[in-house]
UniProtKB/Swiss-Prot annotation:
GO annotations of cellular component type: cytosol
NCBIfam families given in the database record: PRK05422.1 (NF003843), smpB (TIGR00086)
The gene coding this protein: smpB
Family under the similarity heading: Belongs to the SmpB family.
Gene Ontology biological process terms from the UniProt entry: trans-translation
Keyword terms: Cytoplasm, RNA-binding
Major localization listed first in the record, in broad terms: cytoplasm
Gene3D superfamilies associated with the record: 2.40.280.10
CDD domains xrefs: SmpB
Pfam hit, one: SmpB
Protein's UniProt name: SsrA-binding protein
Compartments, as annotated in UniProt: Cytoplasm
HAMAP family on file: SmpB
Length: 160
């Protein structure tokens, strides 16, 4: 995966399945505690958010399931690829997340990971899981929108 520039920040990884499997209710920007070889591996653009999720334990937010492969030029000091990593949020934000996630069927899902001013940030979303019929409705809606824009494009071309 290559590093892309988006809105003045270098995007390392995105969780494209998250928007398909979840309804995004709210987003937060969080810092992440990393070791040196993890940052070097991220600078190479290597990370996977596919199975990642966040939990709140004892007033701290932890990111689980994030895969950052070992640094290619690392030695015995390399990190464990799937270790649990701490997310850095303000206390008020954590309390708000705990309150909202306890309301029912809501989870914390990372949407993207990026560099901002040399620091790695995680875009974290409070989300609710979609049912299969919700996914089918979204797919039908997107297909209809695509057909409408295609037809409008054809009509505009025909007028020239």
């Amino acid at each position: 995966m290559t590093v892309m520039k988006e809105k003045g920040r270098k995007v390392i990884a995105t969780n494209r399945r998250a928007r398909h499997n979840y309804t995004i209710l709210d987003t937060y920007e969080a810092g992440i505690v990393l070791v040196g070889t993890e940052v070097k591996s991220l600078r190479e653009g290597k990370a996977s958010l596919v199975d990642a999720f966040a939990t709140v334990d004892n007033g701290e937010v932890w990111l689980r399931g994030l895969h950052i492969p070992e640094f290619s030029h690392g030695t015995w000091t390399n990190h464990s690829p799937r270790r649990v990593r701490k997310l850095l949020l303000h206390k008020r934000e954590i309390e708000r997340l705990v309150g909202k996630s306890r309301e029912g069927n809501q989870t914390l899902v990372p949407l993207s990971m990026y560099f901002s001013d040399g620091k790695v940030k995680v875009e974290l979303a409070l989300a609710r899981g979609k049912q299969d019929y919700d996914k089918r409705q979204d797919l039908a809606r997107r297909t209809a929108e695509r057909e409408v824009t295609r037809e409008l494009g054809r009509r505009v071309k025909g007028m020239r």
